[in-house]
């Protein structure tokens, strides 16, 4: 029986989301086909084979279950537990944001010679860096909102003022390399500017100031390596504010509609752009590609998630369910794609 190792946790602002997503993935893996190995990464970055109750993962008490936490070390082929070598057939890194989607875990798994679900090192790192992603998208004829890149060492107030004069308010101030809308502030006047910059810089050394696009957010899920399955597009509606971390995982005032109520021609255009990005950036396994669409039908790239949320109400599984892939089948196909990619 093949051994599937599911990774969760890590030193990331999205630690809690990872636990919830991973618990759902583990539940979906067929125990008659696969032996599941649950590997937790503590915020200290210590790795453990967790053999306790899955509910403890979901409610984040797994590290308190000491008798079921067995510390792992790495080898060039798998893991070492005591004197035993453990080599999973496929590793499913259900890790979001920092260290999970930025190429770090992918590089480690490459060094360990382990097949894994999702995009490779370069593609993961590129999609995490929104500024570089948008520069490359521009070469493909795919538009992004007007954006100013700032670094912790170069953030001239005069440059910021010129950007605001050119594009006006509202603007979004966001970390260049963070996921799940962490550290993002919608700014409507200068009084909130410095506070928003401080918040964003807490997540990294580079920050984006981006013109707010009036319209709706549309997502497009893609599954596959050579042969692609394009999921249904979804649309996000908010009573107020923007689709921040709390809205993404608690749905306080957000409504997600799948399939998105789009004219057929516009939907086709969005899917074409999503496929172009997926192919040209060398994405594999899965991704959710998010756009803004104005009332006039203009399309702007927002971001690409190379390991989108996998909770029970997450967008990516819902997109795939709409085209006939249940959560369980989706997980099984991702495992198969990882094996195919390694070959």
Curated annotation (Swiss-Prot):
Chain ranges of the ATP-grasp domain: 134-336
Positions that bind Mn(2+) 2: 303, 305
Enzyme class: ligase
An example Gene Ontology CC term for this record: cytosol
Keywords for this protein: Antibiotic resistance, ATP-binding, Cell membrane, Cell shape, Cell wall biogenesis/degradation, Ligase, Magnesium, Manganese, Membrane, Metal-binding, Nucleotide-binding, Peptidoglycan synthesis
GO molecular function: ATP binding; D-alanine-D-alanine ligase activity; D-alanine-D-serine ligase activity; metal ion binding
Main location as per UniProt: membrane
Chain positions recorded as Mg(2+) 2 binding sites: 303, 305
EC number(s) per entry: 6.3.2.35
Residue sites binding Mg(2+) 1 per the record: 290, 303
Induction annotation: Expression probably regulated by upstream promoter elements. Part of the probable VanC-type operon associated with vancomycin resistance.
The protein, known as: Vancomycin C-type resistance protein VanC1
Protein's organism: Enterococcus gallinarum
Taxon lineage: Bacteria, Bacillati, Bacillota, Bacilli, Lactobacillales
Gene name per UniProt: vanC1
């Amino acid at each position: 029986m093949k051994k599937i190792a599911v990774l969760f946790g890590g030193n990331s602002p999205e630690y809690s989301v990872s636990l919830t997503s991973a618990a759902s993935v583990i539940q979906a893996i067929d125990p008659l086909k696969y032996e599941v190995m649950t590997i937790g990464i503590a915020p200290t970055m210590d790795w453990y084979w967790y053999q306790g109750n899955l509910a403890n993962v979901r409610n984040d008490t797994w590290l308190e279950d000491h008798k079921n936490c067995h510390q792992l070390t790495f080898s060039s082929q798998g893991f070492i537990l005591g004197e035993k070598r453990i080599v999973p057939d496929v590793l499913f890194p259900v890790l979001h944001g920092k260290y999970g989607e930025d190429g770090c875990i992918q590089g480690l798994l490459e060094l360990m010679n382990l097949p894994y679900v999702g995009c490779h090192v370069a593609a993961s790192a590129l999609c995490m860096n929104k500024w570089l992603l948008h520069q490359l998208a521009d070469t493909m004829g795919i538009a992004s909102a007007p954006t100013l890149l700032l670094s912790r060492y170069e953030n001239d107030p005069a440059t910021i003022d010129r950007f605001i004069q050119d594009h006006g308010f509202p603007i979004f101030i966001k970390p260049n390399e963070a996921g799940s809308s962490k550290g993002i502030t919608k700014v409507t006047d200068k009084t909130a500017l410095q506070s928003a910059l401080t918040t964003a810089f807490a997540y990294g050394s580079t920050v984006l100031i981006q013109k707010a696009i009036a319209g709706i957010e549309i997502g497009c899920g893609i599954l596959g390596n050579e042969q692609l399955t394009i999921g249904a597009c979804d649309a996000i509606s908010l009573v107020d504010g923007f689709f921040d971390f709390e809205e993404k995982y608690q749905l306080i005032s957000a409504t997600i509609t799948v399939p998105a109520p789009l004219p057929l021609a516009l939907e086709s255009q969005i899917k074409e752009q999503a496929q172009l990005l997926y192919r040209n950036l060398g994405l594999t396994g899965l991704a959710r590609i998010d756009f803004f669409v104005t009332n006039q039908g203009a399309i702007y790239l927002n971001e690409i998630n190379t390991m989108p949320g996998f909770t029970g109400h997450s967008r990516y599984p819902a997109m795939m369910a709409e085209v006939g892939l249940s959560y369980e089948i989706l997980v099984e196909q991702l495992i198969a794609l990882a094996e195919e990619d390694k070959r």
